[in-house]
């Protein structure tokens, strides 16, 4: 399993993460299908494997992997609006009276309840890696909302989960702008060919560059007029490439073939072995990559009082 995005959270207290206890806790809130009148459900699933015997916590070396699944019924807003409009017009025509907001809202609720059993089902899963020794939780998502859904549900079943988004001492925008402007990144990091530039003024312009030489005059001209880099494609060593944004979100992670080939060799012929090998190698790589990234961004910022 190779993460494609990364939201990084710092555990602010030492928690005794025990795989068996965590397994028991997650089992109290399993993922389940939506009932006929439910809009959404959320719960934990096995990250690898299927069936009742598949563990909810995958453990490899000092790392743990968990997964949560959201199931939701999709009701297009336009369908609901059209049905409400039709019903309101019918009432007003037949009863010769005006339908006001309170009654309109009631009609909308009734229509939603009537439509729910026939609505399409959408399922989505979110994975999180727990690294207790490093004090980190890494969520495979670029959406803070999806990450918070998982973390808050994990907090619910554990009773406590003191975490916060990891922050650095120097704003990523300042560092990325400097790297492009000076045409030199931190050690072991390499600027690639994609970036987003934004004007710092309110309602300022946005320039998105793709497959472009970021050392060229055009980019330097944008920087000289006050634009800053808010997204930048980078590579680290010869192991991975990614897009970093101004919110410290790592997107579009891609692990190089050398790592993937090694995981394939380590994992053997079974699917579970392949998944375990790739997860383990990914986490060991993160063990070197993330401290280097934090250092390149001025080091981790520890808020006062923590």
Swiss-Prot record:
Cell compartments where the protein resides: Cytoplasm, Nucleoid
Record-level GO cellular component terms: bacterial nucleoid; cytoplasm
Keywords: Cytoplasm, DNA recombination
One Pfam family hit: RdgC
Gene Ontology MF terms in the entry: double-stranded DNA binding
Listed InterPro entries: RdgC
Single Gene Ontology BP annotation: DNA recombination
PANTHER family reported in the protein's UniProt record: RECOMBINATION-ASSOCIATED PROTEIN RDGC
Free-text function comment from the UniProt entry: May be involved in recombination.
HAMAP family, A to Z: RdgC (MF_00194)
Family: Belongs to the RdgC family.
Protein's recorded name: Recombination-associated protein RdgC
Gene: rdgC
